[in-house]
Amino acid sequence: VISLQLNPSGMEAEFLKCLNLCFGDWGNRQTYHWYFQRKTAYPDADLMVLRKNDELAAGSAITYRKISLPNEAVVTVGIMTGSWTLPKFRGQGFFARIIEESIRLTAEKKGALVLGFGRTENSSFRQFAKAGAALFPTTYLFSTPETKPQAVASKLKREEKSEPVIKKLFERLSTSGVGFLRFAYSSAQEFSAQFIHRPGETEILSDSYGNLGIVEKKAGTNLLQLFLPSADDESGITSALAAFLNHSLENGRKLFLYSTRADVAQVGKNLGLGVKAGFLPALIADESSLRKGLGIDEPLTTKDSSLLALPATPWHLNPWNVHSGDRA
């Protein structure tokens, strides 16, 4: 018998232990608090644990956020995050149950969509496909021992975390996202809570060409949580990403970033970064909220989330512009 418990008390240590068991070095209590317990402008995260015959088997969280659609309408979404199944219980339908419960919880909060983040090599890819999700391609980029420094015209320097600098980052992020589906931040303060006040130490970096970014340090890796080239073409993206790559390598560190953009992925490959294919699944939760956001009059005859990936329909959700640091 599979039982599901929502927001159980006193489970933090056990849930964290399972995350680290299933994902390797997932994080500590500070990481756990940042992802699941911090107060934001959105509804509190929901945690669920699943048991089989009273034995702990799986768990997941749903965090709630807002995204801007290409027409600038804003809708609430639920994000499946930290979803784990203990090894002995894999392949027994727990992840499918987590997806179902995530849709139900998100719809309760009038959330239009359930989103997630994953690599196509993982079993979750097949599970989301089976659940009928629209699957949008993403890329994980990372330096390898073979990645070499690049010739760059300008070195990065560290910026103060001052109000004007944060405002500049927030405004650049807002303008660079126009025309894309993207995570919405209503103020510089909300932006700062997501990108600057993170579990690890963060740095704001810039160069003389106006390239900007935020790096979070984790072990020996610089996580490029926000990447804002001054020019949004191949040349501009190349010079900006090369600067962040060199900055990491010169300091004896690896570089990692995530992107939903094919042009950023191609530049990363050209610079010698390692690449892993990922996916962003989207499932309809509250259809009326999504319909209203998209400005569609006619309801769907069936709640078919795969329509979201079809260019010929008014339900099409593309292109996405999601940064590494958006994903929580």
List PLM regions with ranges:
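Conserved acetyl-CoA binding element of GNAT-fold acetyltransferases
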Residues: 74-87, 220-232
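Extreme N-terminal starter segment of soluble prokaryotic enzymes
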Residues: 1-2
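Active-site/acyl-donor-binding loops of N-acyltransferases
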Residues: 64, 113-155, 213-235, 242-328
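Hydrophobic, well-ordered secondary-structure scaffolds
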Residues: 79-81, 85, 97-105, 110, ...
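Conserved beta-strand in the GNAT
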Residues: 47-49, 55-65, 79, 84, ...
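Flexible helix-coil transition and linker loops at the boundaries of alpha-helical arrays
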Residues: 69-71
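Conserved acetyl-CoA-binding loop-helix of GNAT-fold acetyltransferases
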Residues: 85, 91-106, 234-247
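Amide-forming acyltransferase catalytic core, primarily the GNAT-like/NAT-type
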Residues: 14-47, 51, 107, 129-230
